[in-house]
From Swiss-Prot:
SUPFAM superfamilies: Nucleic acid-binding proteins. One of its GO terms (cellular component) is nucleus. Keywords: DNA damage, DNA repair, DNA-binding, Nucleus, Phosphoprotein, Ubl conjugation. This is SOSS complex subunit B1. The modification Phosphothreonine is found at residue 117.
């Protein structure tokens, strides 16, 4: 035996709902992108009224005044309004007409701000939880460059000073190399020494000739 649920006991997220209600109104047909026809109907029992969404041929068969048994339905919030749906394996069966005690009020499909706040809070929780991870990951890299800059300013010459001190010493090395290159240039100036010897020899020969 399946237990029947009253309209007043329907809450968002409930599944496997079994109800008996009478159809009060049938709404306009709207078509989805897939070509399905969707119709929203207003139904009621003795505890209140609610909207139910019916698809395709079933929606065309439902008429106001029909007494219908819903099996394996579920409830969800659509645009801030509590709505009934036929779930997978669910069924709508006509069991009578007109003769049923019902109450049109309260209407449980009226827009409820609580449903909107719940949906907004759920979205905000999801949005807040997702960005926290990237923020945590971006924090450590920001600290590491600061530590590197401190090491560059410190006495340790391995990371930072490679670019700093060496360029200052670089200009000192080239002049030293130039000095070493100038030495071989001075060495060829040495040979004039031996060239002076033939001059002295010439003087001696002249002296000897005078003698």
């Amino acid at each position: 035996m399946t237990t029947e649920t009253f309209v007043k006991d329907i809450k968002p997220g409930l599944k496997n709902l079994n109800l008996i209600f009478i159809v009060l109104e049938t709404g306009r047909v709207t078509k989805t992108k897939d070509g399905h026809e969707v119709r929203t109907c207003k139904v009621a029992d003795k505890t209140g009224s609610i909207n139910i969404s019916v698809w395709d041929d079933v929606g065309n068969l439902i008429q106001p005044g029909d007494i219908i048994r819903l099996t394996k339905g579920y409830a969800s919030v659509f645009k801030g309004c509590l709505t009934l749906y036929t779930g997978r394996g669910g069924d709508l069966q006509k069991i009578g007409e007109f003769c049923m005690v019902y109450s049109e009020v309260p209407n449980f499909s009226e827009p409820n701000p609580e449903y909107n706040t719940q949906q907004a809070s759920n979205k905000s929780v999801q949005n807040d939880s997702s960005p926290t991870a990237p923020q945590a990951t971006t924090g450590p890299p920001a600290a590491s460059p600061a530590s590197e800059s401190q090491n560059g300013n410190g006495l340790s010459t391995q990371p930072g000073p490679v670019g700093g001190p060496h360029p200052s010493h670089a200009p000192s090395h080239p002049p030293s190399t130039r000095i070493t290159r100038s030495q071989p240039n001075h060495t060829p100036s040495g040979p004039p020494g031996p060239s002076s010897s033939p001059v002295s020899n010439g003087k001696e020969t002249r002296r000897s000739s005078k003698r």
